[in-house]
């Protein structure tokens, strides 16, 4: 008994429509699921120390950055911690040194939102074999705002921290990595720029994170041949102070991991592909959002932004 789509009595254009439908399902369902299964269960996490003995983490005193640094220390990597608050840096360094007495830790106090140059970072990493860079530092709006409501100081700081800092730090470390022909660079983007088609009332933030995504994916293609793995990681909500302030999410849940849970998944994905959403529930959300028409997602995101604006 023949199915409707392959019956010889059916007009040719029905066969064509069935074929197009098959290609659509292949593209939308099968290939993403196969890629997800392969990266989660078949590919072995890379041995991180092969990239080099030091790892540098920006925005390292709290949230995802601190958790990243802690996870890298578990792998025996020496740490360069960069953040603007010296006292917090010293506190984190002391905590890590007690827990991991066998590693070396260097702290660099630096405010990425300032107008000054990056000489302090250049001096701080001089002579060190930095094999892994985690470009984690990032800021967003203090509250949901229309584009015309964002003051110049706010959007200037967002551009400096999210865009300029990522570019500069990547540029400063990729040269030595190229000389050694090994290294890993992880740039943290956001679901606001990659997973959803728009992020109303946070437009500048989303635009900077879209830049991070495009930069990372292009650099992945450029430098893979030289042994440098450049990767864009795309988190959705993680239970951090910034997310608490923006989205009023103050504790972990099934779809909102703690920084520690997220970082464990994120470190395991270093060097595997040009772009990923490391936490399993985030990647599931990404897949499901991709099945919804963009205009519906846009309407949903706008309603969320307007509600947050009314409450601020």
Curated annotation (Swiss-Prot):
Q: Which Pfam families match?
A: adh_short
What organism is this sequence from? Arabidopsis thaliana (Mouse-ear cress)
So where does substrate get bound? 190
Q: Does the keyword NADP apply?
A: yes
Where along the chain is NADP(+) bound?
52-81
Q: Which residues form the active site?
A: 205 (proton acceptor)
Q: What happens when the gene is disrupted?
A: No visible phenotype.
Do you know which InterPro entries this protein is assigned to?
NAD(P)-bd_dom_sf, Sc_DH/Rdtase_CS, SDR_fam, VLCFA-Steroid_DH
EC number(s) from the headed UniProt entry:
1.-.-.-
Q: List the CDD domains.
A: 17beta-HSD1_like_SDR_c (cd05356)
Q: Which domain of life is it from?
A: Eukaryota
The protein's name is: Very-long-chain 3-oxoacyl-CoA reductase-like protein At1g24470
* Disulphide bridges: none
> Could you name the Gene Ontology cellular component terms for this entry?
endoplasmic reticulum; endoplasmic reticulum membrane
What is the recorded membrane topology of this protein? Single-pass membrane protein
Keyword Membrane listed:
yes
The GO terms this record gives for MF are: ketoreductase activity
The record's keywords, sorted A to Z, are: Endoplasmic reticulum, Membrane, NADP, Oxidoreductase, Transmembrane, Transmembrane helix
Residues annotated as transmembrane:
14-34
Where is the protein found, in the record's own terms?
A: Endoplasmic reticulum membrane
């Amino acid at each position: 008994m023949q199915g409707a789509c392959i019956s010889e009595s059916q007009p040719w254009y029905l066969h064509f429509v069935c074929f197009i439908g098959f290609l659509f399902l292949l593209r939308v369902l099968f290939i993403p699921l196969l890629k997800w299964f392969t990266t989660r269960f078949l590919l072995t996490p890379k041995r991180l120390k092969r990239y080099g003995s030091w790892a540098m983490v920006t925005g390292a005193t709290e949230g995802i950055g601190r958790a990243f640094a802690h996870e890298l220390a578990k792998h025996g990597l020496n740490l360069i911690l960069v953040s603007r608050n010296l006292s917090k840096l010293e506190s984190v360094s002391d905590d890590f040194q007690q827990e991991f007495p066998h590693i070396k830790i260097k702290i660099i106090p630096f405010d990425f939102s300032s107008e000054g140059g990056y000489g302090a970072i250049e001096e701080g990493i001089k002579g060190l074999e930095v094999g892994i860079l985690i470009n984690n530092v990032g800021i967003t709006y203090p509250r949901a705002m229309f584009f015309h409501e964002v003051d110049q100081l706010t959007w200037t700081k967002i551009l400096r921290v999210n865009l300029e800092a990522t570019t500069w730090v990547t540029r400063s470390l990729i040269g030595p990595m190229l000389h050694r022909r090994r290294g890993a660079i992880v740039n943290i983007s956001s679901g606001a720029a990659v997973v959803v088609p728009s992020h109303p009332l946070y437009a500048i933030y989303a635009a900077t994170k879209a830049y991070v995504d495009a930069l990372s994916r292009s650099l992945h293609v450029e430098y893979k041949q030289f042994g440098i793995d450049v990767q864009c990681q795309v988190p959705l909500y993680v239970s951090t102070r910034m997310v608490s302030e923006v989205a009023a999410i103050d504790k972990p849940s099934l779809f909102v991991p703690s920084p520690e849970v997220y970082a464990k998944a994120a470190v395991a994905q270093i060097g595997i592909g040009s772009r990923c959403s490391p936490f399993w529930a985030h990647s599931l959300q990404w897949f499901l959002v991709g099945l919804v028409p963009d205009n519906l997602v846009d309407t949903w995101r706008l309603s969320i932004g307007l509600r947050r604006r009314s409450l601020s």
